[in-house]
Amino acid sequence: MPSSLWKHCLNHLEGELDPQEFNTYIRPLQAIQQGTSLQLYAPNQFVIDWVQNCAESRINALLSHYSSGRIEKALLEVGSCSLQPQPHIQAVELTSKSARSSSRVVDRIPESRLNKNYTFDSFVEGKSNQLPRAASHQVAENPGSAYNPLFIYGGVGLGKTHLMHAVGNYIRSRNPSARVVYLHSEQFVAEMIKALQLNAINEFKTRYRSVDILLIDDIQFFAGKERSQEEFFYTFNTLLEVQHQIILTCDRFPKEVNGLEERLTSRFGWGLTVAVEPPELETRVAILMNKASIENIILSDDVAFFLGRLIYSNIRELEGALRRVIAYSRFTHRPITMELTREALKDLLTLQEKLVTIENIQKTVAEYYKIRVSDLSSKRRSRVVARPRQTAMSLSKELTDHSLTEIGKFFGGRDHTTVLHACRKINELKSIDRRMAEDYHNLLKKLST
């Protein structure tokens, strides 16, 4: 009964929930009956937290309905009801057999191209990347079965590639014989074109359909390239049929990439799609402190927070600014102080001061949500105004040095508790509402260009 009961619940929930939420938090749950309860095993704590906050009461109601009252509630726990050996071991053994049967094919497997510096240990975790990090680690522990494919999307320089390499390095550290291949989508296209020119397309197909783990970066570059999409489509299907892990990254949600065929974007949704958001201030500071320690540099809190507020939407640019400060310190033989930091980044500071003001934030938010700037300072409380107002307050706190009280004055004289509530509300929504997270990310990009 448990499997059919849970299947009924799944079918019902799939019709009620947003597809992204269902695939991310509900589909991965595994069910087994325990007395008058149904034990639901989740891959990680983040899934449990979401289910408890957003779906637990509905699940309990459905369980009671479909079991005629025999099952009273669901119990949530991190784990798996499977007693089978770790899937990653099985997958590697499977491909090892095929490898022994044809050493010529193995010789054609491309090199891994993994960056050894990109590991889970070197990845700085924060609220903005908790779910992608947890999902990636789950895939590394159970490749081919946890989430397949794993699709990670987000802006440039937010850690997508780092997570992808971290999975590959983790798997290789546990099983050196695993055939893990990383490449950029443009490289896939270039190699396919060369194979066509050399009349060696069959060899090309064999190379990428014989790997254990395929990691492809920036799949938006497949857009408009019909032959490349066709080849990748069949490679994708072949690997999934034998439960070999695929991880893909993109700069936006897959269905928003113009020129990608529907048959591809629909398959990307078979596994798990997660977004990497721009890191919050505390995470940016932690990243800076981590990079400074690697360089044996002691970075003061005031300098770290100054840099974290200065650059907020791109980790690569953040690290680049730190490298400039360190280099300037070494060239001038002076310690890293606020004064030196301002000297080293004076051109960037001049540009930022022109761009990021509360007035500019209000104008950008108003244009984005198609409301008047004056609405943000008005007493109107309708949702069409309240949510943009809260968003603008949150952006003002993140991107400027103004206090909560000062920010409130720009929004109709609201007090600091109202601003604080707005910031907390937006942070909460970003973690559970994909549309809110995308809106916030888009606004950050607009304000940083």
From Swiss-Prot:
Similarity section: Belongs to the DnaA family.
Keyword field contains Translocase: no
Domain comment (free text): Domain I is involved in oligomerization and binding regulators, domain II is flexibile and of varying length in different bacteria, domain III forms the AAA+ region, while domain IV binds dsDNA.
NCBIfam families noted in UniProt: DnaA
GO CC entries: cytoplasm; plasma membrane
Protein's name according to its UniProt entry: Chromosomal replication initiator protein DnaA
Chief site of localization: cytoplasm
Localisation per UniProt entry: Cytoplasm
The UniProt record lists the keyword ATP-binding: yes
Gene: dnaA
Role description: Plays an essential role in the initiation and regulation of chromosomal replication. ATP-DnaA binds to the origin of replication (oriC) to initiate formation of the DNA replication initiation complex once per cell cycle. Binds the DnaA box (a 9 base pair repeat at the origin) and separates the double-stranded (ds)DNA. Forms a right-handed helical filament on oriC DNA; dsDNA binds to the exterior of the filament while single-stranded (ss)DNA is stabiized in the filament's interior.
Species, as recorded: Nitrosococcus oceani (strain ATCC 19707 / BCRC 17464 / JCM 30415 / NCIMB 11848 / C-107)
Quaternary context: Oligomerizes as a right-handed, spiral filament on DNA at oriC.
Region described as Domain III, AAA+ region: 113-329
